[in-house]
UniProtKB/Swiss-Prot annotation:
One of its GO terms (cellular component) is cytosol. The gene is ligA. GO terms for biological process: DNA repair; DNA replication. This is DNA ligase. InterPro entries: BRCT_dom (IPR001357), BRCT_dom_sf (IPR036420), DisA/LigA_HHH (IPR041663), DNA_ligase (IPR001679), DNA_ligase_AS (IPR018239), DNA_ligase_CS (IPR033136), DNAligase_adenylation (IPR013839), DNAligase_N (IPR013840).
């Protein structure tokens, strides 16, 4: 029997309230209130009520986050308060100039008296996304607009409702009749990478960066597409009616930026947790310096620090110019993109024979370094850029990221320039280059190519592989060019006399090199396997394979005769299995293996090898049993699936988000926001080594 209308109305109200709270907890606080299955069931119940009783649908219902019909076009809307851009400062001196200007103006406004109120500065990370203006009427989101020209923007309410970190209704009693919230919509890095990977698979044009992807997403006419891209949002500014009196609330009209951010957070908005208040410019500069170094570890992109006068009365006294507020300035990070002129196109041949075109250009300062070269990756990239000699190109370098050519400014191309192509012959050995079907890489397949030999040797002696000291690139280059070393096993036949004749190689250095080469014979099996340089077999995968197969003999036999055994290992994909099979079937590689064994290189597990993974995988211990784990960042030796399997087999549980019930947060490189959340909640934080130690107890 159907419930009566008053009961249904009450039930739908309760469901809306609970589901909105659950959304806020999950997407903003990162602390789930309920399991996904519970949420889904309640959500379906609400959908069912609204389907049969459309009059009960409200604007703040979670069901309204997704509009059903794509818009035909966007409507222009005028901002009640202009959405201005900020002036920029590019160094400390320009920040000081801004400080002098605002103090001078405040003293003038104060009739040239001494300003009694000290100036505090609110420092916020400048999120690299798209500015939005959100309008709420009586606590319900009624309009969302882009910045546009600052005076008017485009109305994109249906799209913005799909952003789960933006509340559809304010989580406060007695909401104001009108409220405008300003903030930045952005695309998290991980989501951006996933979108571009999908677009690459579908042969669609890739987005240049998360900012462009965010802007393009917000202008999609179909909210379903916007929802699928999982945008996020940080609120940073609010405008309340001056006569608003929040009766019954402990929230009063904020008088400063830090208080406004607390208000926004209490009202249900996501605010950036890294905002700080400082009393001096030197503190501001220190904050900026810290984040200039740390910014690449954040899960979203930033392009500077916004410095604001914290006190709203002082902001009002300072006012605005025609384009920007006087009370705020953006202290920008060093440029990460810049135009420059192409000088030359050279080619690098890697250890696997892959030929990579490299653009050489006039030096430019980028991200704190002077950049002269940038990789073009492969022939496809070279072709898509349509690169000509003497072109003006745009180069990007973000932090530790390898410089890359973003685009060509064809409007500045010289009239008589000629197009550049990948050579048909290897630039090192002059053998014919080969490109396989559906392969992006163009390769030299000559095993005697000096560049391939040098690359293989550099990889073999590296710290992550055989860790042979004293054999750097210069030594390897001399050994190969003189014909002393033609393959990896030749290293183990070197003697002092062979090394003495090399540049900068004295008797003492030669002795150390011979000792280090001899010592490398007992390196752990996984490092030896990694050192062989098999395509697609990285350091972590080598550990997995070495754990599953105790020797080269076992692995070689499986690769050639029963590759399905290798495919069953978690973390090893079909591409890796095929690569292993191809490598071990190659006669020249088999000769390398045979010679290494003859010369005393183990190529098998020994008693000294770490068996941490093997000893744990089927065990159960009290340190893990019943405990809850969350992972963040990239693990060095294993992937997340393997780590999860290890935890579960040891009796633990893996969750996707941090909550008060979490026992351990396992951190890899480049940890995300979960790290700061864990610190706030006092969760025990461990690294990869701690994790293995925990499992082996």
């Amino acid at each position: 029997m159907e419930q009566n209308s008053s009961n249904l109305s009450k039930r739908s109200f309760e469901l809306r309230k609970l589901l909105n709270r659950a959304n806020h907890a999950y997407y903003v606080l990162d602390t789930p209130l309920m399991e996904d299955t519970v949420y889904d069931r309640l959500y379906r119940e609400l959908l069912n009520i609204e389907k049969n009783h459309p009059s009960l649908i409200t604007a703040d219902s979670p069901s309204q986050r997704l509009g059903s019909t794509p818009a035909k076009e966007f409507v222009k809307v005028e901002h009640k308060i202009p959405l201005m851009s900020l002036d920029n400062a590019f160094n400390f001196e320009e920040l000081q100039d801004w400080d002098l200007r605002i103090r001078k103006l405040l003293n003038q406004k104060n009739n040239f008296g001494i300003l009694k109120t000290s100036i505090d500065f609110a420092c916020e990370l400048k999120i690299d996304g798209s500015a939005l203006a959100l309008s709420y009427a009586n606590g319900v989101l009624v309009q969302a607009a882009t910045r546009g020209d600052g005076v008017a923007g485009e109305e994109i309410t249906a799209n913005v409702k799909t952003i789960t970190s933006i509340p559809l209704s304010l989580d406060i009693e007695n909401p104001p009749s009108w409220l405008e919230v300003r903030g930045e919509a952005f695309l998290p890095k991980q989501t951006f990478d996933g979108i571009n990977l999908l677009r690459k698979q579908q042969r669609e044009a890739l987005f240049a960066n998360p900012r462009n992807a965010c802007a393009g997403t917000l202008r999609q006419l179909d909210p379903q597409i916007v929802a699928s891209r999982q945008l996020d949002f940080f609120a940073y500014k609010m405008y309340l009616p001056k006569d608003w009196d929040p009766q019954g609330e402990n929230i009063h009209q904020p008088e400063a930026q830090d208080a406004a951010l607390k208000w926004l957070k209490k009202a249900g908005f996501k605010v950036n947790p890294n905002t700080k208040i400082f009393k001096s410019l030197h503190e501001v500069q220190s904050f900026f310096d810290i984040w200039e170094k740390k910014r690449h570890k954040l899960p979203y992109t930033t392009d500077g620090v916004v410095v604001k006068v914290n006190n709203f009365k002082l902001q009002e006294m300072l006012g605005v110019t025609q384009k920007s507020p006087r009370w705020a300035i953006a202290l920008k990070y060093p440029a990460e993109e810049a135009p420059t002129k192409l000088i030359n196109l050279s080619y690098q041949v890697g250890r696997t024979g892959t030929v990579t075109p490299v653009a050489e250009f006039e030096p430019i300062p980028l991200a704190g370094t002077i950049v002269r070269k940038a990789t073009l990756h492969n022939a496809d990239r070279l072709q898509s850029l349509d690169l000509h000699n003497e072109d003006t190109i745009v180069v990007r370098k973000a932090g530790e990221i390898i410089p890359e050519v973003v685009c060509v400014l064809k409007e500045l191309r010289p009239q008589n320039s000629t197009r550049l192509y990948l050579p048909s012959n290897c630039p090192e050995c002059d053998e014919k280059l080969v490109r396989g079907t559906d392969q992006a890489a163009t390769k030299c397949v000559n095993n005697l190519c000096p560049a391939i030999i040098q690359g293989a040797l550099r990889h073999w002696v590296s710290k992550k592989a055989m860790n042979i000291d004293g054999v750097g690139s210069k030594v390897i280059e001399q050994l190969v060019n003189k014909g002393i070393v033609k393959s990896i096993p030749d290293l183990y036949e070197l003697n002092y006399q062979m090394l003495f004749g090399l540049e900068r190689m004295g008797e003492k250095s030669a002795h150390k090199v011979i000792e280090s080469i001899e010592k490398s014979k007992t390196q752990p099996w996984n490092k030896q396997l990694y050192g062989l340089g098999i395509l697609h077999i990285g350091e972590g995968n080598a550990k997995l394979l070495a754990n599953a197969f105790a020797s080269e003999d076992e692995l070689s036999h499986a690769a050639i005769n029963s590759p399905e055994r290798i495919a069953k290992i978690h973390g090893i994909g079909n591409e890796m299995v095929e690569s292993l099979q191809e490598w071990f079937e190659d006669e020249s590689n088999q000769r390398i293996i045979s010679r290494l064994k003859e010369l005393g290189v183990q190529l098998k597990s020994t008693a000294n090898d770490s068996g941490a993974i093997k000893s744990v995988i089927n065990s159960s211990n009290k340190e893990v049993l019943g405990k809850r784990f969350v992972l963040t960042g990239t693990m060095e030796s294993i992937n997340r699936d393997v780590a999860q399997e290890m935890i579960e087999k040891a009796g633990g549980k893996v969750n996707s988000s941090i909550s008060s019930k979490t026992t351990y947060l396992i951190t890899g490189s480049n940890p995300g926001s979960k790290l700061s959340k864990a610190k706030e909640l006092g969760i025990k934080i461990i690294n990869e080594e701690d994790f293995f130690n925990l499992l082996s107890k």
